[in-house]
């Protein structure tokens, strides 16, 4: 009812259930907006009807959608063309059809949401996926929003292609570890890293890893991330895992004596200098 039929009553009901009140839920929305780095968004209600202090931008809507697309249930709902739900108090169920015409008119369309108010005009957040590349297009106050959205998506698919920057299992670096073979643990990409790039565009790869690790470390243990992107923009994060193990040496009398003697001789040599 909320996403397929733009149910404002459903939005209010969900807000009260999750936030205790419309105002409480709006505060949660603004907190999440801050986490996403949305500089041009502020919410005062859950349904989007005009209100003082309630605003957003096309870029922020695209970022919100990218975050929402990480939720499998959201992705499933926004690409549902038709649904039948129980209708309390009636002998028959209620049918709901998605208002997003692109779902049946545009190749690869998989969302997202229509919207209209007199103040904002006809608005559409649209999404489509082809060859593993997901695009989001946002049109605001667009009388011909279907054609405009299709044109934006067409441009995106023509101008960009998905490129594999990292292969699954590829060694990208190492982390110092005293008990690892050679004194360092090799680090590998846990998944393939693919990002959309224009022709001739070169990506960057930055590693987020600890300065060192202590044993024991299991092979496959999470150690950090590889950041992929272009310019200054981060486009993807690939988990990094240990490509080998580091086992803590077992304590033995001989090993302990060896360490004590090594420390003693090192101290003695320093006193002679």
State where each predicted segment sits.
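Active-site-adjacent loops and short helices of periplasmic peptidoglycan-processing enzymes
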Residues: 1-59, 63-72
């Amino acid at each position: 009812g909320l996403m397929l039929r733009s149910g404002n009553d459903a939005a209010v009901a969900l807000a009260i259930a999750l936030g205790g009140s419309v105002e409480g839920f709006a505060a949660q929305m603004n907190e999440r907006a801050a986490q996403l780095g949305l500089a041009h968004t502020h919410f005062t209600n859950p349904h989007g009807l005009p209100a003082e202090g309630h605003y957003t931008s096309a870029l922020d809507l695209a970022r919100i959608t990218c975050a929402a697309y990480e939720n499998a249930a959201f992705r499933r709902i926004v690409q549902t063309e038709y649904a039948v739900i129980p209708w309390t108090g009636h002998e028959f169920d209620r049918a709901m059809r998605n208002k997003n015409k692109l779902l049946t008119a545009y190749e690869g369309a998989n969302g997202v949401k229509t919207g209209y108010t007199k103040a904002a005009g006809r608005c559409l957040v649209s999404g489509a996926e082809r060859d593993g590349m997901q695009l989001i297009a946002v049109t605001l106050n667009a009388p011909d929003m279907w054609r405009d959205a299709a044109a934006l998506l067409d441009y995106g698919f023509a101008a960009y292609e998905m490129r594999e920057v990292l292969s699954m299992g590829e060694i990208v670096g190492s982390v110092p570890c005293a008990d690892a073979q050679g004194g360092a643990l090799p680090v590998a990409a846990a998944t393939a890293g693919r990002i959309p790039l224009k022709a001739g565009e070169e990506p960057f790869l930055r590693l987020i890893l600890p300065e060192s690790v202590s044993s024991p470390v299991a092979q496959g243990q999470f150690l950090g991330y590889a950041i992929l992107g272009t310019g200054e923009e981060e486009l993807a994060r690939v988990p990094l895992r240990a490509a080998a193990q580091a086992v803590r040496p077992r304590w033995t009398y001989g090993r302990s004596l060896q360490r004590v003697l090594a420390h003693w001789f090192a101290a003695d040599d320093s006193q002679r200098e």
